[in-house]
Design a protein with these regions (language model features):
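Secretory targeting and sorting signals
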Residues: 1-28
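A short beta-strand motif characteristic of beta-propeller blades
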Residues: 70-82, 124-130, 177-184, 224-232, ...
């Protein structure tokens, strides 16, 4: 995509004139509207800022556009690492939509921030706790109707690599769960930790050793490794993973480090004991480089993966049995949209938000089945941030 370098000042916001996307520093429009489009929700990004970490917040409008929330970015009370984490899920929303959980990779902590009625964030009381290891990179949360919610954190730092569990109360209190820590060997480089839909299975990826952990979760919230876990990946560099929203027994995992043009995605059947078996003739080629992050449409029909080194977003159709068919890839601008990482769909599934960490922006796409169409200007992220993790509410 050819980019023009001319710059104009429009309505107080700096706009880069481009043949395709533009980056806007998003001048403040009146709350509730942006070009006539009403606010329908928010988007949040873990800035992973070195020293005092923050979370950037944006109003999400009906047309997919974003405008900064007043007071953004919001302090987490912990410290970021100031560099890429190579992980998915560094920011999560609680099942009731009232809290955000953010990793503070520089201070080995997890922060809990309460989402106010207008979308702004405030640190919850007692909202910064030890992650139970070194360099937390990913967090997962699942709802439990008869007790406190359950949280697991993946710690990816040498000397303290593990999965550690917590309980999470309705008041936003995160408390360590005794006997929950599952130690990982140094060099595992955890990439993601995630629950299936009912919280009975937890999976984790190891980028450093190209393996996948799979566990059953007992009523007390403790982990029990599946027979054969950890499972050897079907390529090098497992980072992003997602359970199919419509089929809890299907897990999809990216294989990021196979080399130029050799990226793949794997599909696994998850057994009753959380054991993993390959689906079809996987892994499934995406003909791009470094597919790292994964998102699945809410109806379970399509899988999207960001190719960080390309840069592009690939789309697969998912068959009923979990086999994948490559639909195609949507290229991103190598100057403004380099380094795509985490991606998340809007609640209604019609807009896809992609972190382009190398371009320091959020890229927005309209979604029609498996087709992606760029929407307007890119949204700039705070200066000094090293963005990891995105949440759309």
């Amino acid at each position: 995509m050819k980019v023009s370098r001319s710059i104009a000042l429009v309505g107080g916001a700096v706009m880069f004139s481009v043949a395709g996307p533009a980056i806007a520093s998003a001048a403040a429009a009146p709350r509730g509207e942006h070009g006539g489009s009403t606010v329908v929700g928010q988007v949040y990004v873990n800035d992973n800022t070195v020293g005092a970490n923050t979370v950037a917040g944006y109003d999400r409008h009906a047309d997919g556009s974003l405008t900064p929330l007043p007071g953004s970015p919001f302090a987490t009370g912990g410290a970021g690492s100031g560099g890429g984490l190579g992980s998915q899920g560094a920011l999560q929303v609680s099942p009731d939509g009232r809290y955000l959980l953010a990793v503070d990779a520089g201070s080995n902590q997890i922060s809990v921030l309460r989402i106010k009625g207008d979308g702004r964030l405030v640190l919850a009381e007692g909202g910064v706790v030890s992650s139970g290891g070194i360099k937390p990179v990913s967090v997962a949360i699942t709802e439990r109707a008869d007790r406190n919610d359950l949280v697991y954190v993946a710690n990816g730092g040498v000397g303290g690599e593990d999965y550690t569990g917590f309980t999470f109360s309705e008041s936003g209190r995160l408390r360590p769960l005794s006997g929950s820590t599952f130690a990982l060997p140094d060099g595992s480089a955890a990439g993601d930790v995630l629950f299936n839909g009912d919280g009975s299975t937890l999976a984790g990826t190891r980028d450093g050793t190209s393996q996948i952990d799979s566990f059953t979760v007992d009523r007390g919230g403790r982990l029990h490794a599946a027979p054969g876990s950890p499972f050897t990946g079907q390529g090098l560099g497992q980072i992003g993973a997602e359970f199919r929203p419509t089929n809890d027994d299907q897990l999809f995992v990216s294989n990021a480090h196979n080399g130029p043009g050799l990226g793949t995605v794997s599909a696994f059947h998850v057994g009753r004991n959380a054991d993993l078996t390959s689906i079809g003739d996987g892994p499934y080629a995406d003909q791009q480089t470094a597919p790292c992050w994964v998102e699945i449409s809410h109806d379970g029909r399509f899988l999207f993966t960001t190719n960080t080194a390309q840069p592009s977003v690939s789309t697969y159709a998912i068959a009923r049995n979990g086999t994948l068919t490559l639909v195609g890839s949507t290229p991103l601008d190598a100057t403004l949209q380099k380094g795509p990482t985490d991606l998340r769909l809007s609640p209604n599934g019609t807009v896809l938000y992609v972190l382009t960490a190398g371009g320091h922006a959020i890229t927005t796409f309209a979604v029609d089945g498996g087709s992606l169409t760029p929407l307007g200007a890119l949204t700039a992220l705070p200066a000094g941030s090293s963005p990891v993790g995105i949440v759309v509410v």
